[in-house]
């Protein structure tokens, strides 16, 4: 999600987007797509970080990546359905998830490594080669608690301008009351989809605070995706400060108010910002 990699292609189609910090104080994005049929360009696709695998597992999703940090190799080889652009990792060896070089392609409109893409057809073919199921596991019962078709959720406190506090792209969301959605901005401008030119917009935004710490001198991060903590849930120009918890590392995060009731969010698209639990004071809510 650095400046040279934007705008991304196909991100508008994602039902859920996760944004989390990586080394160098930049962020990377992971889109969760329930319906990706017909998508001819998705990306750019970059390398895996371990915590993104945990977030993907919350949705019983196939995890797609091009390469990985060495710290992610073990989890990728631990019965995780993943599709990778690389077949091995120096210092680790063979990796599962490689379905051939035809799964991804590069364009000439921007320099490497920001020019690697895939498509729905390529991913479907890869799942066939790797014998992955495209159906939900029989025990998966969904992630969020959504409002019913005839319901609209609002909270007590107003939140029409919100910032997660990331240092490099300095993103924010502004609420559009006429449409009932939050519009996304970063690098001082509207964030758009490369294919449509449309600005990204979301029915729900979640700031999820996690313990984060460096793994080495290169700044590779560990993000605790299981311990739980504070979260802020935004919808319809309002917000609730709450607590998030998980039953185990692969189960969905659940959000609860101060009375212990699970938070209900509105139907539609959701953007999740993973924030350092030590940087809560950098969050802006207006």
Where are the language model's segments positioned?
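A surface/extracellular/periplasmic glyco- and lipid-processing/surface-interacting theme
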Residues: 1-18, 23-286
């Amino acid at each position: 999600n650095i400046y040279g990699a934007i705008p991304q292609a196909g991100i508008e189609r994602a039902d859920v987007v996760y944004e989390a910090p990586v080394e160098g104080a930049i962020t990377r994005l992971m889109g969760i797509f329930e319906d990706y049929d017909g998508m001819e360009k998705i990306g750019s696709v970059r390398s895996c970080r371990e915590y993104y695998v945990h977030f993907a597992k919350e949705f019983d999703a196939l995890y797609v990546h091009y390469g990985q940090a060495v710290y992610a190799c073990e989890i990728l080889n631990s019965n995780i359905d993943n599709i990778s652009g690389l077949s091995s990792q120096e210092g680790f060896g063979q990796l599962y998830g490689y379905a051939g070089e035809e799964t991804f392609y590069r364009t000439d409109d921007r320099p490497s490594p920001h020019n690697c893409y895939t498509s729905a057809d390529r991913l479907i073919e890869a799942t066939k080669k790797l014998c992955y199921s495209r159906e939900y596991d029989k025990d998966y019962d969904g992630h969020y608690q959504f409002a019913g078709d005839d319901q609209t959720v609002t909270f007590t406190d107003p939140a029409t301008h919100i910032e997660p506090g990331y240092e490099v792209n300095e993103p924010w969301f502004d609420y559009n009351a006429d449409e009932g959605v939050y519009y996304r901005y970063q690098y001082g401008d509207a964030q758009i989809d490369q294919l449509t030119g449309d600005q990204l917009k979301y029915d729900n935004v979640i700031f999820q605070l996690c313990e984060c710490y460096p793994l080495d001198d290169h700044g590779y991060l560990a993000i605790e995706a299981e311990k739980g903590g504070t979260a802020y849930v935004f919808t319809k120009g309002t917000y609730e400060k709450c607590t998030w918890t998980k039953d185990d590392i692969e189960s969905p995060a659940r959000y609860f108010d101060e009375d212990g009731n699970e938070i209900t969010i509105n139907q539609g698209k959701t953007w999740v910002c993973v924030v350092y639990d030590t940087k809560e004071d950098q969050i802006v809510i207006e």
